[in-house]
């Protein structure tokens, strides 16, 4: 199997040669560069002057005069502007979610070069001057008409009044916010993108050639950026696709574009591929394809040892399987821990590259217990702690590991019915003295939490020599928690975050509960365990995808937004159709070069899972030329 990155490395070396020092290779994400560098080194028996590797977001950051704003600070700055413009009395913790949403909308506005004044104009004005919108095509005009049919300005309700009132302020908030951020020398990503595009001078760029590899959906800024560099003779483009989904007609009624190939076809027309079409006909080549239904999520994880043995056995003796040619792709990241527990000992190396919910780690429950202890669990008027808050801390595994007195103290408090113990009763060793010292003020609370996390770090340092995959994961969760709390502490100490301790409690809990750990290992070694997004540009010989259910791929529902769907569509912004097409591309692109493909889905209906296979599986079942084996898991055995 020849991978896409191998093809690119081979072609680029033939065209440019050994000296790639004046070349920047741009990927959608940084991960692919590690694989690519290995393939590039194989092209020559002599030393190669290495190119620069950069992700698209890093490239725009390098070209921007501003620093990337800390996400928490960005919301805090928006909160100040929001209160000034609306005279709202909303608290920061109530605003925080809406603030993230608004920044996401502004980000999309800028990345798609939307005229913010027109978008956020008074809705009545927008309706009145709709006919003058020459920049809209017929489809966009229809989207605006549908919006006003469904959203009658004349029929006012309390909810509509609130929406219209806020909408009329969004333009002022947008401009005021961007002005304030520029004054501070920081920006959100879309603001950087727009500025770089508007001020771009290709002849002043650092590198002679910019090689764009493996992109799919492009926003307006990226498209314009690519065009400017192509016109300046500085750009090369490598697109990955398969003729199966760029040529496939549906019901013989052209024009029809397969969902997975919709954006690639647009890109190929504007930016021709450096590679010939002949190398992109692999999806129709012989493959072993299996669809397996499972009764539960965990049953899929327990099937892994059998799958690993089957792909190892299938290989010929003269071509033994390499672990890095095997990939376990999780459509549901909550399956990571069951999957790690299920990997057999014969797998020597495992590399995890995916986001994992911080809320599913021991560090999260420990920090949450400490926050409750020092806020709602401590009565400042009596100087006593609440028993339930104390018990949660004493029973936690981290406390038991760091304190020899914790277990005995917990039993004593229970036996003596000490429902409101004094701090002095609880300080029975050095660690417990740190834990049960009351903290007042938001800065003191954050400092306390970082000190506690440093104590926990000692535990993981002691176990570091074992190189256990779970310890690696928990160390990442510790670092993520420490970084997040320390960022808040810096904002507080710099006077940029001035809130009540109860607001800080809710804000901390919200931030920790919604955070993901960006877990990164050594990608060029071992079996790969990853999420769907992390598979971009990578190819694997043996592939298993878990939780390939409708609702998991593509994810159920669209992203929340202040900007209604029809207006997003009319102004050329990102919509749910874009995201579904992106996931369709990820699915087909991942399968196209694999030789052994096993797709599992859960038949139980719970949460996001509807108990049915993903639409992409159904589509592949109907359209693909392969004979697909349909099986089911029963008591851990495939039947």
Tell what function each PLM region has:
Residues 1-568, 625-631, 635:
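Nucleic acid-machinery interaction/catalytic patches
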């Amino acid at each position: 199997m020849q991978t896409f990155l191998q093809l690119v490395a081979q072609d680029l070396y033939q065209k440019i040669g050994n000296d790639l020092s004046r070349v920047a290779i741009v990927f959608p994400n940084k991960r692919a560069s590690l694989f690519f560098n290995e393939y590039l080194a194989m092209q020559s028996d002599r030393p190669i002057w290495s190119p620069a590797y950069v992700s698209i977001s890093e490239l725009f950051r390098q070209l921007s005069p501003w620093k990337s704003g800390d996400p928490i600070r960005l919301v805090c700055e928006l909160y100040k502007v929001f209160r000034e413009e609306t005279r709202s009395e909303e608290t920061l913790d109530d605003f925080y979610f809406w603030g993230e949403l608004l920044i996401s909308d502004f980000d999309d506005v800028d990345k798609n070069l939307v005229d913010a004044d027109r978008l956020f104009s008074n809705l009545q004005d927008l309706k009145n001057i709709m006919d003058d919108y020459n920049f809209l095509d017929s489809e966009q005009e229809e989207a605006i008409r549908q919006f006003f049919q469904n959203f009658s300005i004349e029929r006012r309700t309390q909810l509509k009044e609130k929406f219209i009132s806020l909408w009329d302020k969004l333009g002022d908030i947008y401009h005021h916010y961007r002005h304030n951020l520029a004054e501070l020398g920081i920006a959100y990503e879309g603001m950087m993108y727009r500025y770089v595009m508007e001020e771009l001078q290709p002849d002043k760029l650092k590198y002679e050639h910019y090689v764009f590899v493996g992109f799919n959906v492009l926003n307006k800024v990226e498209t314009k950026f690519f065009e400017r560099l192509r016109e300046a003779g500085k750009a090369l483009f490598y697109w990955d696709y398969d003729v199966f989904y760029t040529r496939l007609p549906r019901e013989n009624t052209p024009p029809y574009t397969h969902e997975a190939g919709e954006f690639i076809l647009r890109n190929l027309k504007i930016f021709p591929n450096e590679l010939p079409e002949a190398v992109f006909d692999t999806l129709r080549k012989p493959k072993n394809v299996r669809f397996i239904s499972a009764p539960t999520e965990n049953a899929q994880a327990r099937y892994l040892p059998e799958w690993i043995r089957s792909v190892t056995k299938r290989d010929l003796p003269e071509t033994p399987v390499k672990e890095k040619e095997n990939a376990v792709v999780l459509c549901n990241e909550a399956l990571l821990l069951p999957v790690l527990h299920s990997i057999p000992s014969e797998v020597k190396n495992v590399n995890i590259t995916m986001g994992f919910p911080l809320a599913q780690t021991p560090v999260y429950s420990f920090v949450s217990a400490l926050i409750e202890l020092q806020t709602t669990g401590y009565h400042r008027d009596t100087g006593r702690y609440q028993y339930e808050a104390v018990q949660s801390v004493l029973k936690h595994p981290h406390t038991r590991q760091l304190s020899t007195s914790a277990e005995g103290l917990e039993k004593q408090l229970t036996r003596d019915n000490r429902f409101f113990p004094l701090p002095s009763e609880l300080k029975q060793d050095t660690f417990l003295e740190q834990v049960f010292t009351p903290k007042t003020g938001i800065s003191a609370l954050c400092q306390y939490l970082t000190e506690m996390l440093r104590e926990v770090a000692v535990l993981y340092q002691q176990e570091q020599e074992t190189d256990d995959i779970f310890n690696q994961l928990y160390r990442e969760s510790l670092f993520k928690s420490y970084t997040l709390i320390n960022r808040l502490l810096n904002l507080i100490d710099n006077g940029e975050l001035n809130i009540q301790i109860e607001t800080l409690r809710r804000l901390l809990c919200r931030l920790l509960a919604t955070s993901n750990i960006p877990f990164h290992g050594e990608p060029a070694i071992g079996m790969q365990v990853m999420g769907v997004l992390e598979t971009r540009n990578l190819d694997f010989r043996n592939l298993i995808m878990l939780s390939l259910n409708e609702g998991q791929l593509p994810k159920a529902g669209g992203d929340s937004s202040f900007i209604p769907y029809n207006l997003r569509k009319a102004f050329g912004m990102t919509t749910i159709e874009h995201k579904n097409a992106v996931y369709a591309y990820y699915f087909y692109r991942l399968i196209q070069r694999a030789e052994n493909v096993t797709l599992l889905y859960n038949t139980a209906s719970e949460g996001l899972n509807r108990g049915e296979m993903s639409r992409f599986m159904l589509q592949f079942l109907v359209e693909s030329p392969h004979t697909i084996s349909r099986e089911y898991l029963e008591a851990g055995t495939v039947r």
